[in-house]
Swiss-Prot record:
GO terms for biological process: proton motive force-driven plasma membrane ATP synthesis. It is found in: Cell inner membrane. PROSITE patterns: ATPASE_A (PS00449). This is ATP synthase subunit a. It comes from Psychrobacter cryohalolentis (strain ATCC BAA-1226 / DSM 17306 / VKM B-2378 / K5). GO terms for cellular component: plasma membrane; proton-transporting ATP synthase complex.
Length: 288
């Protein structure tokens, strides 16, 4: 594919999602190119990101469900041993970092870690393999293969990463209000970090405190989502740039980068999980 397109077209093709949305003047349709996808704005859905994220979520649930069905107290198989190791790893991190009493946090952390890891893992597939298959299927259906877009790494889509981070943010707000009450939650936003014994001075400080605390609060989901997106997007872009090089150089660079990238995809899943645990712990804490 790289040989049939210019460098710019090749990179743009691999970084464009399979998008369905509302295009002004043409109605609801699948975007024919990156310009149409951009013109759709917020009235669009990235079908490939949805397909892969939901599919990998089902794979995660299916694997853990099958292991739970066949669990044995004797010598475990390789799959059971791997699942038990992951569960124990996540559980230990929750015990060490979460000070609340909710039983939701451990399953939440496990889901986040494994799901993000599986989505990140797709970045290790050859960059042209799945898009080439998608292009051939599109050609059989009468479409121009150069205008068939199919990204396979959901975490390189900010809609996915920010969607997950703002879902965590909703839980943070819920547990903050649940544990501290509405008054306590509002007090955290308006009475800290600056306080005064003089009530008039305290009233003056309320808008300042609110601005500072609100920015701190809203920065949590934004930084959580963009950190994952930025690291995975950069990793995917490097793989694409390597694919543009001569064949003999590709192997010399792609293998070391893929080995190093295994650390990145695992680390990013771990960081997202740990920050979720810490944020939920802070939300459940009655101390400020």
């Amino acid at each position: 594919m790289a040989g049939e397109q210019t460098t710019t077209e090749y990179i743009s093709h691999h970084l464009t999602n399979w998008t369905y949305g509302y295009l002004p003047g043409e109605g609801w349709k699948v975007a024919y190119n990156a310009e149409e996808a951009s013109a759709m704005g917020f009235k669009a859905i990235h079908l490939d990101s949805m397909l892969w994220s939901i599919g990998l979520g089902i794979v995660f649930c299916a694997i853990f469900w099958m292991v739970a069905r066949k669990v044995t107290s004797g010598v475990p198989g390789k799959t059971q041993a791997a699942v038990e190791m992951i569960v124990e790893f996540v559980d230990n991190n929750v015990r060490d970092s979460y000070s609340g009493t909710s039983k939701l946090i451990a399953p939440l952390a496990l889901t986040i870690f494994v799901w993000i890891f599986l989505m990140n893992l797709m970045d290790l597939l050859p960059v042209d393999f799945i898009p080439m298959i998608a292009g051939q299927i599109g050609a059989l259906m009468g479409h121009d293969p150069h205008h068939v877009y199919f990204k396979i790494v959901p975490t390189t889509d900010p809609n996915i990463t920010l969607g997950m981070s703002f879902s965590v943010f909703i839980l943070i707000l819920f547990y903050s209000i649940k544990e501290k009450g509405l008054g306590g939650f509002v007090g955290e936003l308006t009475l800290h970090p600056f306080s005064a014994k003089n009530p008039i001075v305290q009233i003056i400080l309320i808008p300042i405190n609110f601005i500072l605390e609100f920015v701190t609060l809203i920065a949590k989901p934004i930084s959580l989502g963009l950190r994952l997106f930025g690291n995975m997007y950069a990793g995917e872009l490097i793989f694409i740039l390597i694919a543009l090089m001569p064949f003999w150089i590709q192997w010399a660079l792609s293998v070391p980068w893929a080995i190093f990238h295994i650390l990145i995809i695992t680390l990013q899943a771990f960081v997202f999980m740990m920050l979720t645990i810490v944020y939920m712990s802070l939300a459940s804490s009655t101390e400020h």
